[in-house]
Amino acid sequence: MICEPSGGYERDLLEALWAAGIVVSLVNAARIRAFARAQGLLAKTDEIDAAVLREFGELLKPVALEAPAPERKKLAALVQRREQLLVTFSTEEQRLVQTRDPAVRKLGARLIKQLQTQVEQLEEMIEKQINDDATLKQQSERLQQVVGIGKVTASTLLAEMPELGKLSRNEAGALAGVAPYNRDSGVLRGRRTIRGGRVQVRRVLSMAALVAARFNPILKAFYQRLVAAGKPKKVALTAVMRKLVILLNHLIKHPEFTLA
């Protein structure tokens, strides 16, 4: 079976397929549309989409999506809820700044306080969920050995990137959305770009890279070399993100590996 993401609505289908023992692949919608366009199919209907999905699966044999373990599933739910509340928290703070009416400001401030309390409760639940599972706890501690990786980044990676430790270097970079893609043709050498990947993974990695570029001795030197060579700071930070996710994947894959 093959399907594509649909804003979370695909989860019930995935759960039902896993429960029935049916192998399923979840493929990025952009790949499916590119596959359709390559065949000259520009129209988009449910019937066309179903036919394209079937043919894509038959020809390219995408990797099957494994059912998450119950403890990972619980962690993912908690982490995703934390992210939702943080987005709402930020939005309400911006609204409060622009609000002038005293009564409305009071209501807004009360809501922000409630959101903050819920975020703190979720942080406690996330920490407990990780500490109650030996594997999650060990992996979280392992990730946090890297300067730049804190509890939030570690919990997000464990929840949103459960494949960590099972990937190749290129797969880790691509899944995080920090793998460089060439745009070359003939003698033309275009700029390398990044795209795709998991949004929340890329977001926490970007924050971790900012810290690592300042305080991680190895990655700081790497970042400074790139900047000194003329690379834009944003490009250099993206390179740090890629180094980070490759290192983190290696740490989980090889428990015997120790950081110098």
What does each model-found stretch correspond to?
Residues 151, 157-229, 233, 259:
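Phosphate-backbone recognition surface of nucleic-acid-processing proteins
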Residues 85, 115, 143-144, 167, ...:
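A short amphipathic alpha-helix within small helical-bundle interaction modules
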Residues 96-152, 161, 213-216, 220:
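Helix-hairpin-helix/helix-loop-helix acidic hairpins
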Residues 1-109, 113-116, 235:
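Phosphate- and other anionic-substrate recognition elements at nucleic-acid/protein interfaces
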Residues 1-4, 49, 53, 85, ...:
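Short, conserved catalytic/metal-binding motifs centered on acidic residues
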Residues 228-260:
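Basic, amphipathic alpha-helical segments enriched in Lys/Arg and hydrophobic/aromatic residues
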